[in-house]
């Protein structure tokens, strides 16, 4: 009982932190420490919760006097626990990076409030056990993201925020419609109970289930930045400061991916493979369009932004395989991408602070004056491309292996070729930015960049440690994958085998 009650700490601590930030007022330095302390304390409880899950299996917390499926349920399995931990680590790094990057004006007002508010929504999305509360937590982190996008009030920010809000409001409307249709069919909102009841539906109801699936895919693909709903991502994510872009790129797209994986495994396993072919088709197109974008620009931010799309597609290929190997790859790669994307955005933020430009054609020769920055970026680039033994390799290895096991050889080849495109896109930044001809930047001995560079190095080191720990993590990732390719593990933990 005590162990299950600890799940709620993952939401309560960030919420208490939010309240504290409101009452602190216009004192940015205190806000920094409060936000960091709240995140660190939540991380400690997240590790405690993970340890409990590893010992006892998925843990369920039922709020109120009702049993599942009638109560509000929170469920923590290994994958959701790992996602929560990685989200908290990334958030701590982002808070530290923000000290020297977002500006005192943003820090004075609602910046840290919005960061913690968004973190609460992200964590809630990972641990909620019913579909309506998934919608609620989506709206929580979306409202926070609106605040983060407009803080600072530049013209570009406001313009891109309008587009971002319109896309997400439309997506949210379709989410409500999908939930309403699903409830009309099964009469429940509990994820595990929906899974049980959908599996018992007569075959004549398969048409309505397919329509519901299409609606959910539209909604979650929008959140994940997958094809065809990726068009908002490069513009909306380009506008705010680097710390906010790192936050969005590392966390928000992963919530959409998680929602696709969870609902596909629980709800749509019996739709004559239509759901998984659809996910695979969208995944491959996402990879292709992401690759085109990554090699089409000289802007360092846009190159990494399009690499977000490539990663989303690669992960969804693993999800579409819906076997143990594919899900292991998807989980490995999701955790890896959360860490390395944050690290790469941090690093290009340092490069911008030095050169005052994101245009590769306007700077070069940085390796002479900033060798630590250069070689740190090189390691991060290799990790992103999936070069062994760095963290990006293991996820892609399992995903490609899964495609070959299932006979989807072309899909595996697309994933492999995407690695070459990713490597080319980031090595181009490395070669031009650090070894190209210097184009006008001046070394400023008084430039305050060492703080954000230190955070960037820490992020890369954590990613490297994650890759080098792959053998130790393998049994944990294998168990995490089981709740997806064998959803009865999840449903039995919630419904007690009923």
UniProtKB/Swiss-Prot annotation:
Pfam families: Proton_antipo_M. InterPro entries: CPA3_Na-H_Antiporter_D (IPR050586), NADH_UbQ_OxRdtase (IPR003918), ND/Mrp_TM (IPR001750). The chain crosses the membrane at residues 5-25, 34-54, 75-95, 109-129, 131-151, 174-194, 207-227, 231-251, 275-295, 303-323, 331-351, 373-393, 407-427, 452-472. It is a multi-pass membrane protein. GO terms for molecular function: antiporter activity; NADH dehydrogenase (ubiquinone) activity. GO terms for cellular component: plasma membrane. Keywords: Antiport, Cell membrane, Hydrogen ion transport, Ion transport, Membrane, Sodium, Sodium transport, Transmembrane, Transmembrane helix, Transport. It is found in: Cell membrane. The keyword Transcription regulation does not apply. One of its GO terms (biological process) is sodium ion transport. The keyword Transmembrane applies. May form a heterooligomeric complex that consists of seven subunits: mnhA1, mnhB1, mnhC1, mnhD1, mnhE1, mnhF1 and mnhG1. Mnh complex is a Na(+)/H(+) antiporter involved in Na(+) excretion. PANTHER family: NA(+)_H(+) ANTIPORTER SUBUNIT D1, NADH DEHYDROGENASE. Belongs to the CPA3 antiporters (TC 2.A.63) subunit D family. This is Na(+)/H(+) antiporter subunit D1. It comes from Staphylococcus saprophyticus subsp. saprophyticus (strain ATCC 15305 / DSM 20229 / NCIMB 8711 / NCTC 7292 / S-41). The lineage of its organism: Bacteria, Bacillati, Bacillota, Bacilli, Bacillales.
């Amino acid at each position: 009982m005590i162990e299950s009650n600890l799940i709620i700490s993952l939401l309560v601590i960030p919420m208490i932190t939010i309240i504290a930030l409101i009452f602190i007022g216009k004192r940015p330095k205190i806000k920094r420490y409060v936000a960091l302390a709240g995140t660190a304390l939540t991380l400690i409880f997240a590790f405690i919760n993970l340890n409990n899950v590893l010992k006892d299996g998925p843990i369920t917390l039922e709020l109120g006097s009702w049993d599942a499926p009638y109560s509000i349920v929170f469920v923590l399995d290994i994958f959701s626990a790992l996602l929560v931990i990685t989200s908290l680590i990334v958030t701590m790094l982002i808070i530290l990076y923000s000290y020297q990057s977002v500006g005192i004006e943003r820090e004075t007002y609602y910046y840290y409030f919005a960061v913690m508010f968004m973190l609460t929504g992200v964590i809630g999305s990972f641990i909620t056990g019913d579909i309506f509360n998934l919608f609620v937590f989506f709206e929580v982190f979306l409202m926070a993201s609106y605040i983060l996008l407009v803080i600072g009030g530049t013209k570009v920010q406001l313009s891109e925020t309008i587009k971002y809000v319109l896309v997400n409001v439309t997506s949210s409307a379709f989410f409500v419609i999908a939930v309403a249709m699903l409830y009309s069919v099964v009469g429940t909102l509990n994820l595990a109970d929906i899974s049980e009841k959908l599996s018992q539906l007569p075959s004549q109801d398969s048409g309505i289930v397919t329509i519901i699936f299409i609606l959910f895919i539209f909604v979650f693909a929008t959140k994940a930045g997958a094809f065809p709903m990726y068009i908002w991502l490069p513009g909306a994510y380009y506008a705010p400061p680097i710390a906010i872009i790192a936050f969005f790129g590392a966390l928000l797209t992963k919530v959409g991916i998680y929602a696709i994986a969870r609902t596909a495994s629980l709800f749509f396993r019996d739709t004559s493979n239509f759901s998984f072919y659809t996910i695979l088709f969208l995944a491959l197109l996402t990879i292709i369009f992401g690759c085109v974008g990554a090699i089409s620009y000289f802007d360092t931010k846009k190159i990494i932004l399009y690499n977000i799309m490539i990663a989303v597609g690669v992960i969804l290929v693993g999800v579409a395989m819906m076997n143990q190997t594919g899900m292991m790859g998807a989980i490995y790669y999701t955790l890896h991408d959360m860490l390395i994307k944050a690290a790469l955005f941090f690093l290009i933020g340092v490069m911008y602070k030095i050169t005052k430009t994101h245009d590769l054609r306007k700077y070069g020769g940085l390796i002479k004056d900033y060798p630590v920055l250069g070689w740190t970026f090189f390691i991060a680039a290799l990790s992103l491309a999936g070069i062994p033994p760095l963290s990006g390799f293991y996820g892609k290895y399992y995903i490609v292996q899964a495609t070959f096991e299932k006979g989807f050889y072309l899909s595996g080849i697309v994933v492999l070729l995407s690695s070459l495109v990713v490597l080319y896109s980031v090595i181009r930044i490395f070669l031009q930015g650090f070894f190209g001809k210097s184009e006008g930047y001046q070394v400023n001995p008084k430039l305050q960049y060492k703080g954000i560079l230190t955070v960037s190095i820490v992020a890369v080191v954590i990613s490297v440690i994650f890759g080098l720990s792959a053998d130790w993590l393998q049994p944990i990732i294998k168990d995490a994958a089981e709740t997806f390719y064998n959803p009865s593990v999840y449903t039995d933990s919630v419904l007690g085998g009923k």
